[in-house]
Design a protein with these regions (language model features):
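An aromatic/glycine/proline-enriched structural segment found at the starts
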Residues: 2-16, 172, 176, 200-201, ...
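Short acidic/His-enriched helical or mixed secondary-structure segments at domain edges of catalytic enzymes
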Residues: 143-159, 244-245, 249-251, 255-257, ...
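A structural supersecondary motif
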Residues: 261-265, 284-325, 445
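M16/insulysin-pitrilysin zinc metalloprotease superfamily fold
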Residues: 73-77, 107-141, 287, 311-368, ...
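Buried hydrophobic packing residues in well-ordered domains
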Residues: 29, 47, 65-66, 87, ...
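Acidic/histidine-enriched segments that form metal/cofactor-coordinating
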Residues: 2-3, 9, 84-194, 240, ...
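M16/MPP (pitrilysin/insulinase) zinc-metallopeptidase core fold and M16-derived inactive scaffolds
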Residues: 44-108, 174, 287-302
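C-terminal regions of mature proteins
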Residues: 1-14, 19-21, 205-210, 352, ...
Length: 454
């Protein structure tokens, strides 16, 4: 008979901490954040420009997106093909990321090639050619992208929900990349003017993360220290505001399933309730066996998956329960959802809180295991106005969340009887059941993009 060794005890994970940056400033005022990460031989560079989307003119919204997407199409020194070949020679990848709060230009490159690659990176950001043919091509690509979104039920629902949750005059209510009526008005001259007016060293932060072969401050100074723009205009980020509660059904005749968004105006990461609401939303609709998924997917079989997520902005934000459901069960699914998201009689439990905290604290070392992960988080913090120790502080607050705190934070934000509803599906089969379920003021509309606005 075989003797088995006793199962070893599993020790709790050690407390992990986010890397601490070394700060410096270039001669032109650009803030520099350096993360020394031994063994990370692919450097990640994020140039964060404080250019919120409300800097765009209302009639040419989308100009920031077109400008950003055209940066690497050629510079004043190198045409597009030559620039692409030079980047490839250095083993570098160039990308952009645009949000309501600002713009990021991103470079990933082997440490041994950082010096030359960062020079090319600086060229793209500071002196792009923004040629007419490239701008016009990206305008057409953006218009095609919008047309494709109009054919996707899930994207229609997300666009319409955004338009309903935020007050209609605010930039947050409209797509980051602009809409057909505004994108079609973007010209090469408008793109050039936007770059000239808003790209510059003032308010800009360069984040470098990795295992550096040379002094990163000196490398950054050589590449970006001479950048000047005396005409640069700073724009204060607009604060979003909540829209009026609405119930919208966007008609897709014959659709066999419907996409649902049920939510409202939310909070940002600087709100003292953020850690508790993160735990609560994970328990309600973040985990695979969350309250929503356990009933609507596992027990009822109404959907392949449903989730609740909070999307913070620099100020405020939004939250939503979202999922796709078979047409014949949409009304019942929403009735069940409204019951489940009410926690007055079913507060969050210790087990739910423990599971959420274990997830958030356990995934952090993996999420930030690479230079890119660290630099991306640092860029997010810069755009949101968060301190350098935000991750560590956030994890400490998460560990202190109690069931009572999670329940109270959730109840203070999520008011089941005051939520905005957007459904994209077959109106002929859905309108009456939805009204009977508790949405009497349901508006039935056609999901043309122009109709996603309040």
């Amino acid at each position: 008979m075989r003797d088995f060794l006793p199962r070893p005890a599993i020790a709790p994970a050690t407390v992990w901490t986010f890397p601490t940056p070394r700060r410096a400033r270039l001669s032109n005022g650009i803030e520099l954040m350096i993360f020394e990460l031994p063994g990370q031989h692919v450097i990640s560079a994020h140039l964060v420009l404080d250019v919120p989307l409300n800097a765009e003119g209302r009639d040419i919204e989308g100009v920031a997106t077109i400008c950003a997407r055209t940066l690497d199409e050629g510079t004043l020194r190198h045409d597009g093909d030559e620039f692409a070949e030079l980047l490839e020679t250095e083993g570098a990848g160039f990308g952009i990321d645009l949000s309501l709060s600002g713009l990021q230009a991103v470079l990933d490159v082997p440490a041994s090639h950082l010096d030359r690659a960062l020079e090319l990176f600086a060229e793209a950001v500071t002196e792009p050619s923004l040629a007419q043919r490239d701008v016009n091509r990206h305008v057409q690509l953006r218009l095609a992208e919008i047309e494709q979104a109009q054919a996707n039920s899930s994207q229609i629902a997300s666009i319409a929900f955004r338009a309903a949750v935020f007050e209609e005059s605010r930039r947050a209510a409209r797509m980051n990349g602009g809409e057909p009526a505004t994108v079609s008005q973007v010209t090469p001259e408008a793109v050039g003017a936007f770059h000239h007016d808003h790209f510059g060293p003032a308010g800009t932060t360069l984040i470098l993360a990795g295992d550096f072969a040379d002094d990163p401050v000196a490398v950054a100074e050589r590449s970006l220290g001479s950048w000047r723009n005396d005409d640069q205009r700073r724009v204060v980020a607009e604060e979003p505001a909540a829209g009026m509660r609405r119930m919208v059904l966007l008609d897709r005749p014959g659709a066999v399933q419907a996409d649902v968004r049920l939510g409202g105006f939310g909070i940002d990461r600087l709100d003292p309730r953020w850690s508790a609401i993160s735990v609560a939303s994970y328990a309600m609709g973040g985990a695979f066996l969350s309250r929503l998924n356990a009933i609507l997917r596992e027990e009822k079989g109404y959907t392949y998956g449903v989730r609740m997520n909070f999307g913070p902005l620099r100020t405020g934000g939004s939250f939503a329960v979202q999922g796709s459901f078979r047409t014949e069960v949409v009304a019942d699914a929403l009735a069940i959802t409204r019951e489940l998201i009410e926690v007055e009689q079913a507060p969050f439990t210790s087990q739910e809180v423990d599971d959420a905290v274990a997830f958030f604290t356990g995934v952090s070392p993996l999420r930030y295991a690479t230079a890119e992960g660290v630099a991306d988080q640092a860029a997010t913090q810069v755009l949101a106005g968060l301190p350098d120790d935000y991750v560590d502080r956030s994890l400490a607050l998460l560990r202190s969340v109690t069931p009572e705190a999670a329940t109270e934070a959730y109840r203070s934000v999520v008011h089941p009887d005051g939520l905005t509803l957007v459904v994209v599906g077959d109106a002929e089969r859905l309108a009456d059941p939805l009204r009977a379920t508790g949405f009497p003021d349901l508006e039935v509309r056609t999901p043309a993009l122009e109709d996603t606005q309040p």
